[in-house]
Amino acid sequence: MALPNQQTVDYPSFKLVIVGDGGTGKTTFVKRHLTGEFEKKYEPTIGVEVHPLDFFTNCGKIRFYCWDTAGQEKFGGLRDGYYIHGQCAIIMFDVTARLTYKNVPTWHRDLCRVCENIPIVLCGNKVDVKNRQVKAKQVTFHRKKNLQYYEISAKSNYNFEKPFLYLARKLAGDANLHFVESPALAPPEVQIDLAAQQQHEAELAAAASQPLPDDDDDTFE
């Protein structure tokens, strides 16, 4: 099925909707992929930029048509036209801004109201910033809703490919799918050293082993 500004191609392609509060880094994240940035198209009727992001797997090429909100979430909710025919999604929050995480359930609800049973990745962005406000142990929404969670840093390219690989495996129904070459990414604007990466991963592993809180509100101590 061809979507607006989406030509028919002879390899699998999927509409990927990216949602989250304004300023969480959604546009920065998508623009790291240089080919997608070069070939983006604007869809004026809905007010989005559509970025075609190509990845090369052991099963061949796949394309994600990434729908970026162009900042209109700052003026309230998004129109249903943004979500319709969405086949997968990324919900993004900013680990340096607590409110953006508290709003994740609202984005998830709006998304699932239109797109039922699609694979969804929750991404905590800006882990390169030292004084994060949302710690790994406080991120529990994905466990309650059975979503995949990754911590990323758009500006450093840290974990850039992981959300796309997870979604590709889910959409293809193949857990052994893997990328055979890296996409061309913009040079990192910041660096995350190996020790910091290992610390992030250790904190995530520790958080995953903790029991879930009883209440629905994720607490911030």
Swiss-Prot record:
GO molecular function: GTP binding; GTPase activity; mRNA binding
Locations listed in the record: Nucleus
Chain residue ranges for the region called Switch-I: 40-48
Annotated TM spans: none
Cellular component GO terms held in the UniProt record: Golgi apparatus; nucleus; plasmodesma; plastid
Small GTPase Ran-type domain mapped to chain residues: 10-174
Region (Switch-II): 71-87
Gene3D superfamilies for the chain: P-loop containing nucleotide triphosphate hydrolases (3.40.50.300)
Quaternary assembly: Found in a nuclear export complex with RanGTP, exportin and pre-miRNA. Interacts with RanBP1a and RanBP1b. Interacts with KPNB1.
Family designation: Belongs to the small GTPase superfamily. Ran family.
General function of this protein: GTP-binding protein involved in nucleocytoplasmic transport. Required for the import of protein into the nucleus and also for RNA export. Involved in chromatin condensation and control of cell cycle.
Protein name (record): GTP-binding nuclear protein Ran-3
Classification of source organism: Eukaryota, Viridiplantae, Streptophyta, Embryophyta, Tracheophyta
Gene for this chain: RAN3
